[in-house]
């Protein structure tokens, strides 16, 4: 079985939001390689005019800094974060959006090929050889299914808004379009199905709704080699208070 981890999917969402909404208020990304996290936490304290280097002894300061982080960083108010480190901790945020591992519908077969690079790494290598060998891994084809959750209750606490939700849908639909590489080939989204509830606490269990979407190989197809080899069946008979939305 092939796996796409939750952190892989969230990384691609973060990357899309960063490039698509660069400079827009509230769309900064906390989890990236520009600065140490503790430095960003201290910057939050300074932006709020709070006393620094108290190591979380002032609970009000931690709360104010946490709210500042949620307001300014899309990924924190979306996915949550543990920010309890350093001299200026910002507490812990439970994110309203959670994503499961993506799992392949059918078993996949990872393959490996050998490549040659027409350059050497060091001067000492140059005396002995002109090329270097490398390897690339790939999967000929695989269809993966992942499920996720949006908690309206937790969204109220982090400030995750309807506008943020639309940005999330856009990011999920387009995240692979700006992340192409030879190894991932034509990786793309094929379906995005949303169950929208009428109440904050939900109108039906998520497992019941997920079961309404099934994926199967087309009749006569033994080994799937493309999206066209599959059929997606959707039971559109929704429980009361649940609306089915097909974003793709």
Task: Outline where the language-model segments fall.
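RNA-binding basic/glycine-rich loop and surface signature characteristic of RAMP-family CRISPR effectors
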Residues: 1-248
